[in-house]
Design a protein with these regions (language model features):
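Generic N-terminal targeting/processing segments that precede catalytic cores or assembly contacts
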Residues: 1-388
Length: 388
């Protein structure tokens, strides 16, 4: 059983569309399953004026009836309120008068390569779809997948580890779901209060210097059974699918599972998670350096992945570029932008991890109705004598 998510829409167009195909019938969905995370995506110190305009809400237009999935594709619409200010420039149909083209690509953005690839003279034909505004639709679809995972006892959370030069200290113990209860009360979604305050100062200082900021976020998933994913082919390895999902988020340039970069410099005896067994606990590990993945499969430990995000490509003091119509030197396009979206990227990361995990459950356990899935998972847990 395949599960997939597809989005459509442009940053300043009429709206965004998300379609999720492959969820079982009978799954209960509430409006807050979609809208809570969409609101969280708009949080974070360093967001720009666009977030004062948009108040994202999801309108389900297919696949649900009376709050339960039908087993058919689920379609979601998210309106762009800012479209009223862009109606002529972004109308799906020919405009009544000539619309001025944009010819100033931004270094680091899809602008230049996109115009080359798709034979476009107007950079706006590329930047509108390449914009991170598209992630609002992904978060809505991720909300559906999170609801599915919750029925299976799986929860997904995120937090910010670094913004620019400020890095939070590594936790002294393994995090638990309850540790994330107040993460959204931090203006940068950081679990360490001192680091959170330093991150806010860093954003303020660099924003005054007309700079944008990147950073690192972490996503953790709890309650996973061993054996999601597979070792038998490269395309079935779950770490590869997660890498694609996280690196598909706009501006993300790096990915890690568990302590990947730290253990690269350690000897093998300090890199792996030893295996133990007791009659009370069953099979267990005392460490989780592998981040919950071994051989492309979940190993039953919490899944831990990280994404490294570069500073945003749109700067309030534009970088040097060219005019693609004249090839003359010019300043890059100055578009309305955020200073820092690392906190929001963590929420998007949750959605993408949820999509990958939901797809892995569907691939392994199938089932046309949610009850079929629950029975299949329970039978598997009994077969491997798994204890959560």
């Amino acid at each position: 059983m395949a599960l997939r998510l597809i989005t459509a829409g442009e940053s300043h167009g009429p709206g965004l569309t998300c379609v999720v195909e492959g969820l079982p019938a009978g799954l209960e969905i509430r409006p807050e399953d979609l809208n809570a995370d969409m609101s969280r995506r708009q949080l974070g110190h360093g967001r720009g004026g666009r977030m004062k305009i948009e108040r994202d809400t999801a309108e389900v237009t297919g696949g649900l009836r009376h709050g339960r999935t039908l087993g058919s594709p689920i379609a979601i619409q998210i309106a762009n309120r800012d479209y009223e200010n862009w109606r002529e420039r972004m109308s799906p149909w020919p405009a009544a008068e000539r619309i001025e083209e944009v010819h100033l690509p931004r270094p680091g953005h899809a602008d230049l390569v996109g115009t080359q690839k798709f034979k476009q003279s107007d950079v706006r034909n590329i930047l509108e779809r390449a914009s991170a505004r598209e992630t609002a639709a992904r978060v809505a679809g991720g909300g559906l997948c999170k609801a599915f995972l919750r029925r299976l006892g799986v929860s997904v959370y995120s937090h910010v580890l670094q913004i620019a030069s400020v890095r939070a200290p590594e936790p002294e113990r393994a995090l638990e779901p309850e540790d994330f209860a107040s993460v959204d009360s931090s203006p940068v979604r950081c679990l360490d209060e001192q680091a959170s305050r330093a991150m806010v100062r860093e954003i303020d200082e660099l924003r005054r210097a007309n700079e944008s900021l990147g950073g690192v976020f972490e996503v953790q998933a709890f309650g996973l059974v061993p054996g999601l994913g597979s070792h038998v082919s490269w395309e079935e390895r779950l770490d590869g699918r997660l890498a694609m999902a996280i690196c598909s988020i706009q501006a993300v340039k790096g990915f890690a599972v568990g302590e990947a970069f730290a253990i690269a410099g350690r000897p093998g005896s300090e890199a792996h998670d030893e295996i133990f067994y007791t009659s009370e606990r069953g099979i267990y590990r005392e460490t989780n350096r592998a981040g919950g993945l071994e051989g492309g499969m979940t190993d039953g430990c919490p899944l831990i992945v990280r994404g490294a995000m570069k500073p945003l490509s749109t700067l309030t003091k534009p970088l040097r570029s060219i005019d693609i119509a004249t090839l003359e030197p010019a300043e890059a396009l100055r578009e309305r932008t955020d200073s820092c979206t690392v906190p929001a990227a963590g929420v998007v990361g949750e959605a993408m991890v949820a999509v990958v995990l939901a797809a892995a459950f569907r691939r392994k356990f199938g089932g046309d109705h949610i009850d079929d899935v629950l029975e299949a998972v329970a039978a598997y847990e009994q077969r491997i004598e798994w204890r959560r």
